[in-house]
Amino acid sequence: MSQAAPAVRPLPAVYAPVTERVGPATLVRGPIGPVESALRLGLGLAWTGLCTLGFLVVLIALLPSRVARINVGNVYGSFVGKGCAWLTGSRYLIHNRAAAHAERPAIYVANHASLIDIFLGAWLSPMNLCGVAKKEIIYYPFFGQFFWLAGHLRIDRGDRGKAVASLKALADIVKKNALSIFIWPEGTRSKDGRLRPFKKGAFHLALSTGLPIVPMVIAGSHKAWEARSLRLSREQVDITVLPPIDTSGWTKETLDEHIREVEAVFAAALPEDQRPLAAAEPARRAA
């Protein structure tokens, strides 16, 4: 028989106290049936569509200004993301959210193991932030088209030259307009929830902009909504915003070392079942 989960499950000591909660106060963990899963996902799609239509008028009026559109996208993301998270039926505990609203721009990086992570990132991102996602996000109903129209960046992971050029252009826009960036450093979703080696794109952005890196650690989302599945499960998902990592002393020569340091920060903050296995590190893509 399923048991009610404790208010906060045991997590690594780096986790700050809970500052926000979305979802049931008392959680009974376990799979959600196919009919209820379909209903919840359908309601999530309907909520996303409703928000898209509501914000689209504002977005069209601001087409001449990319920065203004980016900010409309940030507000839109907070509505869509929080609503979709609530509709999954899981409980989301936010730790140290204030760290995601620092006055200084930053590069926010998060691990990625579930489709719901995209909505969590959209919900918790501060204003004046440009998101970076794979080009295929355009095919996500409503959300992907709005992401593109709002001026956020889509990159072609299959074409390194184009990806690098896009990130260089983004660095110029960020420096000119004092924007933050949100990027998934693993480059793709983890199939089993375990942390994957980070690609270099986010860290080249740190070098070219001088912005600090703010880790956003997501624990448990791979159980709430498994990768490549339409079945949901009632789980507890913890999202912690960790203190910023200064990048002002980074150089190209020490970049690989700094990437490993940031990976270690994530690994230490994740539960044991999401830490990378002790195995040889796969080769990184240059981008």
Features from the language model and the residues they span:
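Catalytic core of membrane glycerolipid acyltransferases/transacylases, capturing the structured
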Residues: 52-74, 78-79, 85-88, 100-160
